Regions:
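Active-site helix of classical SDR
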Residues: 123, 164, 172
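Alpha-helical segment proximal to the catalytic Tyr-Lys
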Residues: 128, 177-181, 240
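Substrate-binding pocket helix/loop in short-chain dehydrogenase/reductase
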Residues: 99-100, 104-112, 212
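Short C-terminal tail/terminal secondary-structure segment
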Residues: 232, 243-264
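Residue(s) in the substrate-gating loop at a strand-loop-helix junction
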Residues: 148
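Active-site loop immediately N-terminal to the catalytic Tyr-X3-Lys motif
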Residues: 101, 153-159, 181-182, 219, ...
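C-terminal helical subdomain
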Residues: 170, 188, 207-238, 242, ...
């Protein structure tokens, strides 16, 4: 059976751990060559090296996506390594923990620079490259933006994060409509609470764990591999008529309008 991304090149940001790394590993299994990008050099280079030892074609490229010049360098390095980009996953993100009255402008700007502006800057750069590839005879590519259930919900203690994710949802729609004439598909994924290093401390606090699970109908946290499966679908041919959508991987949280009992 042919691998769904055989011969494709994928670029994934924020990919040294968690959901980003799970997507890299899934794309490798799907047959893609991958640019693994992160601002954490030790973790990113280490993960790329480990994957290469298993036979994968993975290159690490440092990038702090808050810096547009570093995004330019990331694109240049990706094209130097593989000559093309067929799939982009904008995944890099940070989270703030201040309430609305306490949030300072510097933090607000930093969160939006990474969680939203970089998705536009890199998304535009990759889309331009994809258009050039199409003109040269290649098939259209796919862009995937990592949103969150919090593009739907308001979190008073994560104001900048919530604002950024709401922006990602709308950016995804705007990009999808703008790029549809070229056949480039743009979609988003909206994870709920996924077991990653980012929330490791949260899920070990029993009170917090119970509160989260009380509003999660499936009664458990998600796994990074489950998000990666959606990223695989959106990158491949099986989603060829899907664009402008946000697919939520949240255990049923968004449609919930009640809390459920939690065992234990």
């Amino acid at each position: 059976m042919a691998k769904t991304l055989e011969g494709k090149v994928a670029l994934v940001t924020g990919a040294a751990q968690g959901i980003g790394l799970a997507i890299v590993k899934r794309y490798v299994a799907d047959g893609a060559a991958v640019i693994l990008s992160d601002r954490n050099d030790a973790a990113g280079a280490g993960q790329a090296e480990a994957l290469r030892k298993s036979g994968a074609d993975v290159r690490f490229v440092h990038c702090d996506v808050a810096e547009p010049k570093q995004i330019e360098a990331l694109m240049a390095a990706s094209l130097k390594a593989f000559g093309r980009v067929d799939v982009l996953v904008n995944n890099a993100a940070i989270i703030d923990t201040a309430g609305f009255l306490d949030l300072d402008l510097e933090t607000f700007d930093q969160v939006l620079a990474i969680n939203l502006r970089s998705y536009f800057v890199l998304g535009q750069a990759v889309a331009r490259q994809m258009v050039a590839q199409i003109k040269a005879g290649s098939a259209p590519g796919a862009i995937i933006n990592m949103s969150s259930v919090n593009d739907h919900f308001a979190l008073p203690d994560h104001v900048a994060y919530t604002v950024a994710k709401g922006g990602v949802r709308q950016l995804t729609r705007a990009m999808a409509v703008a790029l549809a004439p070229q056949g480039i598909r743009v979609n988003a994924i909206g994870p709920g609470t996924i077991v990653t290093p980012l929330i490791a401390n949260v899920v070990t606090d029993d009170a917090v764990r119970r509160r989260i699970l009380s509003r999660t109908p499936l009664g458990r946290f998600g796994e990074a591999d489950e998000v990666a499966s959606i990223a695989s679908f959106l990158a491949g041919r099986d989603s060829s008529y899907v664009t402008g959508e946000t697919i939520y991987c949240d255990g049923g949280r968004i449609p919930l309008n009640y809390t459920v009992p939690v065992a234990g």
